[in-house]
A protein has these predicted regions:
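AAA+ P-loop NTPase catalytic core and its hallmark functional loops
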Residues: 1-142
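Hydrophobic transmembrane alpha-helix bundles
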Residues: 113-121, 184-193
Length: 193
């Protein structure tokens, strides 16, 4: 199974768990015990692919916890299953410097095998064939510069992207724009909005 967590949306509680309200004592002294989050229990009890997305957008506290998890394969007393694999993603690439991300220091990067993945327009068209309506696929195929913005990004301005084309297709399909009786003017207006 795949266990996915978006590090940018995690808090320390999402990473470590929350304290148990039951009173616990160890050798006669009060102690706090923790209820581990479900994803961590799963990754510790069975082999999974643990996918951590947007690690470079996580808070520093969460990143430090992920650092321990990836370095020692344990956190807060929980040990990952021996066959659990960890894969993480960051926002990089040619435009990575224009995203609001935290820079990863050499000690963090040293814990990973790093692959730079830059999908081409051909890669996207291959994926999109059959995933999006043919009219949009044909448009992108014949107007490839419209797939994704090139150049610098201005703040608060929306640009075309692979994700936005997929969302556009999903939205237009949900209102029947692509059917035989579809409103082609609406199709154009949605695409240029």
């Amino acid at each position: 199974p795949i266990v996915e967590r978006r590090a940018s949306q995690m808090t320390e509680g999402d990473l470590l768990g929350l304290p148990d309200t039951a009173e616990t004592s160890i050798n006669g002294r009060k102690a706090t015990t923790w209820n581990a989050p479900d994803w961590l229990v799963t990754a510790c009890e069975q082999p999974v692919l643990l996918f951590l997305d947007e690690v470079d957008r996580a808070t520093q506290e969460v990143r430090q916890g992920l650092f321990e998890l990836t370095d020692s394969r344990k956190i807060n007393g929980w040990h990952l299953h021996a066959e659990t694999l960890i894969v993480a993603a960051v926002n990089g690439g040619e435009n990575g410097a224009q995203y609001q991300v935290g820079e990863m220091d050499p000690a963090e990067l040293d814990r990973w095998t790093v692959f730079d993945v830059e999908p081409s327009t051909e890669d996207w068209l291959k994926w999109a064939n059959g995933q999006i309506p043919s009219i949009v696929w044909d448009f992108i195929n014949h107007n490839r510069k419209h797939l994704e913005h090139e150049g610098d990004f201005e703040p608060n301005k929306v640009y075309p992207s692979r994700r936005s084309w997929k969302r556009y297709c999903d939205t237009a399909e949900s209102v029947g724009v692509f059917g035989e009786d579809g409103d082609r003017d609406m199709l154009f207006n949605l695409a240029t909005a």
